[in-house]
């Protein structure tokens, strides 16, 4: 009975007026006030009157700082470096709810990562609403972008792995890939958001590339890195997606051969261009198409993991797991393939090398330590 119900995030920006009518909600906090949440709650419990005001962040130019020094996962830390998006894909509400691109100052990010490293974390993951846009909002004289940020963080002692969140395919040029491949910490694990393998569908989505350009990006990564993991997102049942368009996407996915695919059924979002498009696809058709691609994803994922059998790899151990009654310590390779070793105390956050000898199940490979 003494708890406060707080509404925060994208839905607040999109439907704040509706939330204000909801008597179950005590506090409404806009996206650009999350950093003040503790203070807002403190004020609320003091006088039960103060509430976060929903602010228009559509034209906000400042990144909201929210520093974290300790994370529940004691091996991998997620570092958000950017917020907002300028892309305006036709199915997406994010530019309206998160505002335009706002990048954190590189010195602030470096300071946070140094603190993370001192706390014992060995791996960081750079994330953002549209990570590839990092730095586009800086003044020209700053000359900062995602690549310069990665190079800066690559120099920090204690950080052994730097993983990237979802990337816009167009950021992957030959120069970009070559520069990444030279770095000590970079993980050859790249999530390139696709959404569709059909050019006609991509055009309706307002994606700013075509299938051939996307494929070229994948080829560049595979030429510059040894057996990189390439993962993606795919939307099925986008308005107007015909059987032939879906078949074209399926053929494209087979040709690229991803490590993992996140398959989403298109969901109508009020306020987006796609919500009012004609030829909305029936739910049953979406489910059929989703099932087809999920089966393909499972097959391709198994095939990619199979390439690691008999190879020497390194895994960063993270947590204990039990498989068929036997306890193991599980972690990930730099490509984000799950590997495990027989359980021992004190292995968490340790890096071990060995050879993958067999699959323990569909997702985890057994590593025999050197």
What are the roles of these predicted feature ranges?
Residues 3, 26, 52, 159-160, ...:
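A structural micro-motif
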Residues 89, 109, 126, 164, ...:
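Conserved, mostly hydrophobic/aromatic
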Residues 1-135, 145, 175, 180, ...:
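Proteins enriched for Cys/Gly/acidic motifs involved in redox and nucleic-acid/cofactor modification
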Residues 276-370:
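Terminal RNA-binding accessory module
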Residues 139-152, 174-188, 241-259, 283-287, ...:
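Short, electropositive alpha-helical surface patch
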Residues 88, 92-99, 161-170, 196-207, ...:
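Conserved strand-turn element in the central/C-terminal portion of the radical SAM core barrel
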Residues 147-148, 152-161, 173-232:
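Radical SAM/AdoMet-radical enzyme domain recognition
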Residues 121-148, 152, 156, 167-175, ...:
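Conserved glycine-rich "GG(E/T)P / GGGxP" loop and the immediately following alpha-helix
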